[in-house]
Amino acid sequence: MLTRFAPSPTGYLHVGNVRTALVCWMYTRNQNGKFLLRFDDTDLQRSDVKYINDIIEDLKWIGIDWDASFKQSERFERYNEVFLQLIKEGHIYACYETREELDIKRKLQLKQGFPPVYDRSALLLTEQEKIRYEQEGRRPHFRFKLDRNEVVKWNDEVKGEINIATSSVSDPVVKREDGIYTYMLPSVTDDVDFNVTHIVRGEDHVTNTAVQIQMIKALKAKIPTFAHLPLLHFDDSKISKRKGGLDIKSIKEDEIEPMALVSYLVKLGTSNPIEACACMQSLIDSFDIKKFSSASAQFSLSEMYKLNSKVLQQMLFEMVQDRLNQIGVGSSEFWYFIRNNIERFSEVAKWWKICKSDIEPVILDKELIKIAFNALPQGDCNENTLSEWVKTIRQTVDIKAKNLFTQLRSALTGTETGPELAKLLIFIGKENIIARLKEK
């Protein structure tokens, strides 16, 4: 089994094509298959090596690896061979209409109630007419000639049986007048040459698939298995304001864990519940492409945020040890305590600093804090220290427990909310507790 992910390096990856990449990757890894990364960069003016590097970085960040990769710009010689072969066999023909002329035809067809399908008038041109057009400075574009008598059928892994009548489809342009190949011919050539067995993409490519099946047949190659995922809809206003959906760059900036994104995207639109999972292999083992519904799915940023904290709660110390070392946290005990109290990993550093560094205590009642200082239990802090401390203070002062907890937390952490104070005292330590109470 071989799947492929084929991004165009003309911009950043967004959640839509990352979802496709994840599904492709998990689909083949579940079957011990291979995964191919291909960059569709035939439009050299719009493609940028910067985006190739960004895409590679983002895929690695998510956890996707690949068995081989290449750029289509390295294979123009091969595309030219296939192009000339298909011209020779009568599958590709030259057209001389300008964009303006094609637009007029399209509008006229729509006005008359006909589908805007190319009328193949270029096939009626004589050699003299073609020469005259070229003498006028017109450069041809080229189309693949569809078999309009065929209804293309395939059993889609997600959408079930699909039938496309090619009589309602225009012959696709495979090469523009400027000599640049469109998506169609290089994509089909690569899929055939590299023996891609399974193609996963968005349902907006369904008509393209019918066209490509005919092109694959023209090359006398084996038809791969297709799966068309329903498109994602974005309901969060925060997302809708971003052009092109939500890109991985902004996901990173929002401090979403890779496995929170993965957990969400591979289950979104399936019959399975969306649950946090910190282990990629368990998601691969349970993956089933047939679980995807053919109905569109709603992407919710707020739901992904909720998953983020749950993923952090599942992460073992070994999974985050390098990241913890980078911020000066070497304690597994602290990680297992704090992971249940954070929404983003960056909050670990905040609470470690509160425990171990100089902070500005917030003293709400100086007299009460003096009493608390004198009532502090002897010895090192443990999980019983806070309850003993509170009991002793309340024997001296008439104060509600909730108010007392707030006063102590503010004095010791500089905040009014946070992780369980009884356990936090252990990490703050007796020396820091004394210093913070004594200062004021």
Swiss-Prot record:
Chain ranges for the short sequence motif 'KMSKS' region as given in the UniProt record: 238-242
Coiled-coil segments: none
Catalysed reactions, as listed in the record: tRNA(Glu) + L-glutamate + ATP = L-glutamyl-tRNA(Glu) + AMP + diphosphate
Motif ('HIGH' region): 7-17
Residues that coordinate or bind ATP: 241
A single GO molecular function term of this UniProt record: tRNA binding
Entry-linked SUPFAM superfamilies: An anticodon-binding domain of class I aminoacyl-tRNA synthetases, Nucleotidylyl transferase
InterPro entries in the record: aa-tRNA-synth_I_cd-bd (IPR045462), aa-tRNA-synth_I_codon-bd_sub2 (IPR020751), aa-tRNA-synth_I_CS (IPR001412), aa_tRNA-synth_I_cd-bd_sf (IPR008925), Glu-tRNA-ligase_bac/mito (IPR004527), Glu/Gln-tRNA-synth (IPR000924), Glu/Gln-tRNA-synth_Ib_cat-dom (IPR020058), GluQ/Sye (IPR049940)
Enzyme class: ligase
Keywords: Aminoacyl-tRNA synthetase, ATP-binding, Cytoplasm, Ligase, Nucleotide-binding, Protein biosynthesis
Domain of life of the organism encoding this protein: Bacteria
Localization in the cell: Cytoplasm
Listed NCBIfam families: gltX_bact
Self-association state and partner proteins as the record states: Monomer.
UniProt name for this protein: Glutamate--tRNA ligase 2
